[in-house]
């Protein structure tokens, strides 16, 4: 059973993807729900609100214990929550589960959201449209990260470009800065499930 954290954000669209793949899933709103699952997706949304609700519903300790034995996939705000920070990121208390740090809303506000056709060669996922909505940028990466994919982004009003990490994984968890649930393409979810849920990769 795959759980989708359903406190805030785009949890419904993740469940639609899981249903399309044919994976049994439930919405996770408390510890009892969490304990029924073998993998967890933390969806995009508003990371400050998500951080507050994780504490309000007393899920922080449960998720941290869960992460020691089972896999978590975080998208956008979920990526922020999985990251490590020595101090609060604009009032967001991260879960410190994966060894990387981020900057929130680094592409700008909602009006600067965008789609970009990308390929994730290191994840065996060919071309698809990735949707970035107030996406975080990866600032630093620790030794625990085993695989990552960077793509080129042009700077505003410039011919120069920067390489930005948009997806990464360690030996148990995975996080991405885009929203793989939005365009209906199931391949990013399938990669996570095959590797960390079914153990096929």
Please report, for each region that a protein language model flagged, where it lies by residue:
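Hydrophobic anchor at the start of a short beta-strand
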Residues: 25-26, 72, 173
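N-terminal beta1-alpha1 cap of cysteine-dependent amidohydrolase-like domains
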Residues: 1-55, 62-65, 123, 186-201
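C-terminal and late-domain segments of enzyme folds
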Residues: 9, 113, 134-201
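Redox-cofactor binding/interface segments in oxidoreductases and associated redox assembly factors
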Residues: 42, 74, 176
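Cysteine-nucleophile active-site neighborhood
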Residues: 47-119
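Beta-strand-turn-beta hairpins that frame and shape the catalytic cleft
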Residues: 1, 125-128, 168-174
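Pocket-forming structural segment of enzyme catalytic cores
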Residues: 87-164
């Amino acid at each position: 059973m795959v759980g989708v954290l359903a406190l805030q954000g785009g949890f419904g669209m993740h469940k639609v993807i899981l249903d399309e793949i044919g994976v049994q899933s439930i919405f996770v709103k408390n510890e009892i729900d969490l304990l029924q699952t073998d993998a967890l997706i933390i969806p995009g949304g508003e990371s400050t609100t998500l951080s507050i609700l994780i504490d309000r519903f007393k899920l922080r300790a449960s998720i941290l214990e869960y992460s020691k034995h089972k896999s978590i996939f975080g998208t956008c705000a979920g990526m922020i929550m999985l990251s490590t920070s020595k101090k609060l990121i604009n009032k967001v208390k991260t879960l410190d589960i994966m060894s990387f740090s981020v900057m929130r809303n680094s592409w700008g506000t909602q009006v600067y959201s965008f789609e970009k056709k990308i390929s994730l060669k290191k994840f065996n996922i060919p071309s698809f449209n990735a949707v970035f909505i107030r996406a975080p940028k990866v600032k630093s990466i620790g030794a625990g990260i085993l695989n990552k994919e960077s793509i080129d982004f042009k700077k505003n009003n410039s011919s120069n470009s920067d390489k930005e990490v948009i997806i990464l994984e360690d030996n148990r968890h995975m996080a991405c800065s885009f929203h793989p649930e939005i365009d209906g393409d199931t391949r990013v979810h399938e990669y996570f499930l095959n590797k960390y849920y079914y153990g096929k990769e």
